[in-house]
Amino acid sequence: GSGLHVHMRIVKDGQNQMLKDGVLSETARKAIAGMMELAPSITAFGNTNPTSYFRLVPHQEAPTNVCWGDRNRSVLVRVPLGWAAKTDMCTLANPLENESHFDTSQKQTVEMRSPDGSADLYQLLAGLAVACRHGFEIENALDIAKRTYVNVNIHQKENEDKLKALAQLPDSCAASAECLQKQRTVFEQYHVFSPAMIDGIICK
């Protein structure tokens, strides 16, 4: 199937909070940690069809495990190339063009890569917002972000040990529903999702 990747950034007072001094900020890493924690249940909003899980297999540039990284298409949450770099990517790609002087720090995003075309967009975006907020609320968020960061292709044979240390995404709608049942209290907090709505998603 086709992926439905979601790029997101956190903005405060009109300023992108994803970078600090040219590197991914603590704010961004906490948000990523929240997504790492709730990733299994987010599939209930973003992968709602049995065939969704045929896509989430190794060597398809689709995620299979709960991890994140820079410019890495084997991870669940990817930090895209270029925005934090001091090099002008436009000039590198188009050497005959004059160097641009745009402030690209406002463009930095992170990309959630598990959802597909079966997603309920309203539920998915609400679920991602809940996950990011959850990352700000848990005390060990930065430890989670550190533990789930990978800088290798986890599906290459030499990285088997790293792969085994990472939690797996659900492999079916039934497994996804079980994950949502276990983590439902986080989504029901602050009345973002009602218990009846969560029940309906689980039963579906």
Residue ranges, per PLM feature:
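Histidine-centered divalent-metal-coordination microenvironment in nucleic-acid enzymes
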Residues: 1-13
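Acidic, His- and aromatic-enriched active-site or binding-groove loops in soluble protein domains
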Residues: 12-21
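C-terminal accessory/tail domains of diverse enzymes
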Residues: 20-204
